[in-house]
Structures are given as structure tokens and as C-alpha cells.
């Protein structure tokens, strides 16, 4: 006589549970694999993990030099930890009001965008604990056409007043995103530091110049031609630190006119980007051993 236990309700229920557990386990493994594969796109193997780049350098006064409102979104972690962990004095300069930007979503009249984005930048830097922030009036998208001597002189005067020992900015050949305004402000930053050293005054420049570096694999996949330009022209980073992704999400909420920028530019929503990209990467130039000529 055949054993009827195989058709018993309890036996059938047990089989279903076993099947569900197996399926769930496979899904967990697949999701975990996809997660770590995604994280690898934003990993930079040359970078050593540190709690704070500014703390690692012994910085006490930090100046960030940028081109547009929202550029500070690349360095949230560095500035937040410089203030909260290291007690550093922090300052920012943004060269343009971002008036030529594309609104994603549209939140204001286009003719008012410069005013709106200036306010967004000032509010975001305040949210990062930044002590002072100047937004200049140079044309968005036209920084390379501005008289370079004027830009350098203005930055020199600002640096003499702030006296930063760490300056944070863009690598001139890549600008983190390939934007020409970023690249020019990176060049102007180097020229200003060189001029301060040449003048040899009471304040003769910072001890370290820190460049924000973009993750190469992700840029190669999602950054298009500009991403390739960045990958081919930026140096490898020596340091990685927490990106303080909570502050990045807060920053995009503050930058309401650019809130959907990541999805618009790279086809990935911000929540997914920062789930995978939770570190900032930096190349550091020790100006005592490697001065700017």
C-alpha cells in the first residue's frame, strides 16, 4: 500500500515553506551580489580610508573654491567632518550664481535663477557648518572667458584674508565633471597659490591643495564623453572618506532647482547613487614638497 504522507496537508505545507526559503535565499544572494557589484563601480582602489582628510592633514582653516552653486555637493563629507570632527574654520567661494543652469525640476522664473541658486548655495553651506561663503558674479558657463588675472587677484585677496592651510578645489585638467568652468577655477586656484608663494608675504599660501576626484568606473559607464574626459585626465586619489550621504540628500533638497540633477545627468536616482557611492575621494598635493611652479 502506498504511503499517503506525501499528500498530507502538513507535508505539503512543509514543502512549500522549504521552496519559499530556497527562493528567498537565492534572491538574497542575487541582491547582495548586485549591491556589491554596484558598489564596485564607485570604488577607487588607490585610496586609503580615513575619518577626515582635513584631520589627516592637520588642517585648521579650510577654503573650498568652486564654480557653481551645488559644486559643494561633491565635498559634503570633507567640510562637514572638518567642522564637526576637527573644529576647523571653513569657508567657500563660488565663482558664479549658476544663472544659466537647467532647472530639474523647474522651481523659479529662469531670469531669477541666479538669485535662487545663490540662496541655495548659501543655505547648503550653512547646513554643512561652513563659517563663511562668498558667491561671486562671474558668468555661468563663461568663466574661461573672464580676465584670468582678475580672477587670480580676487582669489589671492580672499586667501590672504581667510589664510587657509588647506584649499579644496578642482583638478584643472578634468574639473571633476569635465565642465569648463570647473577646470578654469581649478587653474585659477593653482595660479593664486603660486602667486602667494612668489609674493612671500606674511601669509604665503596653504600647506596642502586637495582635489576632489570622481569614481572612474562609474563615470566611464554613465558619464558619456565628459565622463571619459575626466577619467583620462584626473589623477588617482590617495584618500577616501565618508561622503556623509545624509548631508548629500539634504543638500539636494536644499538645491531645489537641481534636486533631480543626478537622475537627469546619470540616469540613476539619488537614493540609488548614494546607496552605492558613500565615499568621497581626494588627491592631495603637499605644497611643501611639491610646490606649484
Question: Language model features by range: what are they?
Answer:
Residues 68, 179-182, 255:
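Histidine-centered active-site/metal-ligand motif
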Residues 102-106, 180, 220-225:
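Short aromatic-enriched loop/helix-cap "lid" or pocket-rim segments at secondary-structure transitions
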Residues 137-138, 169-173, 213-214:
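Short, well-ordered beta-to-alpha junction loops that form the rim of enzyme active sites
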Amino acid at each position: 500500500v502506498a504511503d499517503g504522507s506525501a499528500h498530507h496537508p502538513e507535508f505539503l505545507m512543509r514543502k512549500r515553506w522549504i521552496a519559499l526559503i530556497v527562493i528567498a535565499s537565492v534572491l538574497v544572494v542575487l541582491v547582495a551580489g548586485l549591491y556589491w557589484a554596484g558598489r564596485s563601480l564607485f570604488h577607487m582602489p588607490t585610496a586609503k580610508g580615513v575619518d577626515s582628510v582635513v584631520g589627516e592633514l592637520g588642517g585648521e582653516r579650510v577654503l573650498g573654491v568652486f564654480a557653481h552653486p551645488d559644486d559643494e555637493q561633491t565635498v559634503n563629507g570633507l567640510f562637514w567632518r572638518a567642522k564637526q570632527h576637527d573644529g576647523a574654520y571653513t569657508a567657500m567661494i563660488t565663482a558664479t550664481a549658476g544663472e544659466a543652469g537647467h532647472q530639474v525640476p523647474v522651481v523659479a522664473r529662469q531670469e531669477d535663477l541666479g538669485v535662487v541658486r545663490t540662496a541655495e548655495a548659501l543655505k547648503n553651506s550653512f547646513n554643512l557648518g561652513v563659517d563663511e561663503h562668498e558667491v561671486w558674479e562671474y558668468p555661468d558657463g563663461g568663466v574661461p572667458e573672464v580676465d584670468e588675472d582678475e580672477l587670480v587677484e580676487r582669489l589671492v585677496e580672499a586667501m590672504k584674508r581667510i589664510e587657509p592651510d588647506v584649499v579644496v578645489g578642482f583638478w584643472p585638467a578634468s574639473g571633476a565633471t569635465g565642465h569648463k568652468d570647473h577646470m578654469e577655477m581649478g587653474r585659477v586656484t593653482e595660479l593664486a597659490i603660486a602667486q602667494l608663494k612668489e609674493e612671500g608675504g606674511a601669509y604665503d599660501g596653504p600647506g596642502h591643495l586637495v582635489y576632489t576626484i570622481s569614481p572612474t568606473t562609474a563615470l566611464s559607464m554613465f558619464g558619456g564623453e565628459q565622463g571619459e574626459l575626466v577619467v583620462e585626465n584626473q589623477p588617482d586619489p590617495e584618500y577616501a572618506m565618508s561622503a556623509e550621504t545624509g548631508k548629500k540628500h539634504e543638500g539636494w533638497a536644499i538645491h531645489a532647482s537641481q534636486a533631480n540633477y543626478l537622475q537627469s545627468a546619470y540616469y540613476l536616482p539619488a537614493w540609488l547613487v548614494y546607496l552605492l557611492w558613500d565615499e568621497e575621494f581626494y588627491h592631495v598635493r603637499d605644497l611643501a614638497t611639491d610646490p606649484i611652479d
